[in-house]
């Protein structure tokens, strides 16, 4: 009878321990909605990583990338997230200053210059205005032309809630510096609306509610690959185009640090990177072969990018400057 009791106790302990390990082998990733959507890169990346890690990947998505850091700050050390994936270089110092992230100590072979030890890039792109060349026959060839023309209507994103919206703010600041407020005053006459995120604005553009929409130089690749149309084009401005580098980082509060580190290493793998050009419609950070559609894109050789510390120190003032110009 005593032996039977010991056997039953051992079975119960084994089942309890197995459940504990099963729960611990879940990797929770906070990201933005389009990354985790069924048409985004998330599902395929989840399947590929789960095959390798014998674990479960769970995406927790917010409406846009700019709100990711806010969500983590509100949750603090009680956050269920292991990894944050989706904000860009303009939030690096803000994120580091929360003291919620840990250095990843990962060596990656990137095709962009990167020196931050808390966050690793997973894709990059350049902002541009997208237009339909069957509707807009004479697109602007410079930011100056766009600012000064009176026959174009555009849709852009709010810099307080959207990373592309903030990107436009920094793009204009990079070109015009102290003259940015007067530029915004002129530009506002052309802006149909500011949307909270990219998805809303691009949808409105596709419904012909404006001549152009703020997006990326890579956006036409989507229409080439999935709609077999080349009528959507990206503007090419002589002043250059502002860059966006999207990153991922591990939280100190992660209950599965080794698994999180494994995923961070997985980011630079072919399995992860091959999903970026076709599903996230951005450039990969590794030298994989790009789809044919990307060979037809215009990518500016003049890449504009501000030091993250300068952005951190000035962002609030520049947003207030933008608000006052409305």
Each predicted region: which residue ranges?
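A ligand-binding cleft/hinge motif common to bilobed small-molecule-binding domains
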Residues: 90-94, 206-231
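Extracytoplasmic ligand-binding site segments that recognize negatively charged/polar headgroups
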Residues: 24-26, 30-42, 63-67, 80-210
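Extracellular/periplasmic bilobal clamshell ligand-binding domains
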Residues: 293-326
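Mature extracytoplasmic/periplasmic domains
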Residues: 251-306
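Periplasmic-binding protein-like
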Residues: 112, 125, 184-188, 194-195, ...
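A bilobed periplasmic-binding-protein/Venus flytrap-type ligand-binding module shared by bacterial periplasmic
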Residues: 128-135, 173, 244-259, 275-278
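Short alpha-helix C-terminal cap/hinge motif
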Residues: 43-59
């Amino acid at each position: 009878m005593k032996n039977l009791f010991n056997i039953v106790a051992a079975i119960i302990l084994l089942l309890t321990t197995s459940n504990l390990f099963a729960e611990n082998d879940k990797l929770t990733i906070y990201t933005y909605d389009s990354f985790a959507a069924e048409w985004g890169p998330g599902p395929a990346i989840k399947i590929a990583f789960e095959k390798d890690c014998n674990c479960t990947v769970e995406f927790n998505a917010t409406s846009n990338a700019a709100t990711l850091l806010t969500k983590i700050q509100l949750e603090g050390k009680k956050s269920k997230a292991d990894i944050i994936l989706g904000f860009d270089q303009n939030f690096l110092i803000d994120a580091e200053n929360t003291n919620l992230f840990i250095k990843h100590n990962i060596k990656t072979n990137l095709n962009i210059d990167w020196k931050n030890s808390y966050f690793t890039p997973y894709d990059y792109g350049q902002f541009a205005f997208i237009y339909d060349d069957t509707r807009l026959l004479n697109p602007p060839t410079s930011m100056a032309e766009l600012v000064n023309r009176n026959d174009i209507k555009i849709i852009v994103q709010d810099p307080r809630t959207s990373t592309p919206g903030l990107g436009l703010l920094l793009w204009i600041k990079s070109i015009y510096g102290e003259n940015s407020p007067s530029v915004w005053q002129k530009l506002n006459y052309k802006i149909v609306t500011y949307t909270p995120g990219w998805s809303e604005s691009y949808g409105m553009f596709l419904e012909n509610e404006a001549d152009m929409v703020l997006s990326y130089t890579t956006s036409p690749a989507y229409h080439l690959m999935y709609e077999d149309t080349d009528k959507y084009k990206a503007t090419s401005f002589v002043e250059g185009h502002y860059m966006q580098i999207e990153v991922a980082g591990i939280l100190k509060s992660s209950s599965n640090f080794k698994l999180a580190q494994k995923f961070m290493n997985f980011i630079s793998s072919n399995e992860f990177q091959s999903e970026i050009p076709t599903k996230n419609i951005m450039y990969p950070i590794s030298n994989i072969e790009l789809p044919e559609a990307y060979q037809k894109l215009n990518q500016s050789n003049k890449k504009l990018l501000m030091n993250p510390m300068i952005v951190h120190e000035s962002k609030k003032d520049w947003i207030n400057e933008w608000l006052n110009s409305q």
